[in-house]
Design a protein with these regions (language model features):
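Conserved N-terminal beta1-alpha1 strand-loop-helix module at the mouth
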Residues: 1-223
Length: 223
């Protein structure tokens, strides 16, 4: 965590890169994308021991629940991130199978106000707000964070959508009572699925030195 915020680094593939990212101070979640259309798609997750407290997240798009459960068991995923049109009932079924669920939403006023309400009792551990794209994330494009003023739910959320090395000052000014952390991906890459470890290290150090307002209690959001 950095300043009480979860840090998720998504879109990993190679063992050495995963090991280096997971070892960075502040990283809580490392993500693997199981969506064939993504340039960061994985067909296998390296069997790399993680530091204490770091959790594996699998990202899926409109995949049957049983397939998600099987993949999670095979690779030791602690959480699953659902980035498609998965229903509240599916989220609940996965939760009942012992998986932490992160449900992603396009960052639109409609999603922030209404779509999230349908998932309020689905057992989701976290929500994720990302830039609306046909590619289901990883676009490197940002969105207007003011949209999230329309979100008044109780489920903590991760902020995604093109966060890059230049985002620290804006993040230090952004407040929301349910902001739990940040999702970092394509703008910290040398090429798809290869994270720039030094760029991440520098960003996290600078973020740690910034004043991050409106902290959420770590006990309420840590997976």
């Amino acid at each position: 965590m950095i300043g009480g915020r979860l840090i998720k680094v998504c879109g990993l593939r190679a063992a050495d890169n995963m090991r280096a990212v997971a070892a960075l101070p502040g990283v809580d979640l490392v993500g693997f994308i199981f969506h064939p259309a993504s340039p960061r798609c994985v067909t296998d997750v390296p069997d790399v021991p993680l530091p204490d407290g770091v959790r594996r997240v699998g990202v899926f798009v409109d995949v049957p629940a049983e397939q998600i459960v099987a993949t999670a068991h095979r690779y030791g995923l602690h959480l699953v991130q659902l980035h498609g049109h998965e229903s509240p009932d599916m989220c609940r079924r996965l939760t009942d199978r012992g998986l932490g669920v992160i449900k992603a939403f396009p960052a639109t006023p409609e999603a922030a106000r209404n779509d999230t309400t349908r998932y309020a009792t689905s057992g989701c551990r976290l929500f994720l707000f990302d830039t609306p794209t046909a590619s289901h994330g990883g676009s490197g494009r940002t969105f207007d964070w003011h949209v999230l003023q329309d979100y008044v739910g109780q489920t903590p959320f991760l902020l995604g959508g093109g966060l890059g090395p230049d985002a620290r000052d804006a993040l230090s000014r952004f407040t929301h009572p349910r902001l739990a952390g940040y999702d970092l991906n394509s703008r910290f890459e040398r090429c798809p699925a290869e994270k720039d470890v030094e760029a991440l290290r520098t960003f996290l150090q600078r973020l740690d030195g910034a004043s991050v307002p409106g902290q959420t209690s770590p006990a309420s959001v840590r997976p």
